Curated annotation (Swiss-Prot):
Residues 126-136 have a biased composition (Basic and acidic residues). It holds the Pfam family RRM_1. This is Nuclear cap-binding protein subunit 2. InterPro entries: NCBP2, NCBP2_RRM, Nucleotide-bd_a/b_plait_sf, RBD_domain_sf, RRM_dom. GO terms for molecular function: RNA cap binding.
Amino acid sequence: MASITRLDAVSPYLIRRFKNDLRALDAVKQSNCVYVGNLSFYTTEEQIYALFSKCGEIRRIIMGVDRFTKTPCGFCFVEYFENQDALDSLKYISRTSLDERIIRADLDHGYEEGRQYGRGASGGQVRDEMREEFDPGRGGYAKNRQPTSSRQLANYSGISSAPLGSSLELQSNPRYNRWKKN
């Protein structure tokens, strides 16, 4: 049998997070603050304002920044004046595209000082540190990804012999410089 899912409902993540605290879950349902994730590192506050203001009057936008470099790290908080505007943004804007990325929006219990900083070990978001693939909109490879020579050393350190005429030393690829005359 088919079912219909409400688009302005609290996410399964928040239900799991507040499963033992129904008061906190009810407070989130009445919140006028929206967490927006999966933003490009290059998305501006003006772009977010232009998109989210279509659902109601915005009180403020707080951009998430890297804890160390203070550069955008792919999330923000949008505070509306009314709860209904926040719910409308979940219905109409969540899972839409902004800067060629599908954004995620969810109700949030409210912004507090310090929450604008990424919580990952490298200063950004935790999910970016776990990413395996190259993502140009989120700064390329994950920040904790090892350089190629370190991975080669770990993968091939057990090899102790080589065919005659070859070497076991790791070779780095020289960078091609198109401006250098050969």
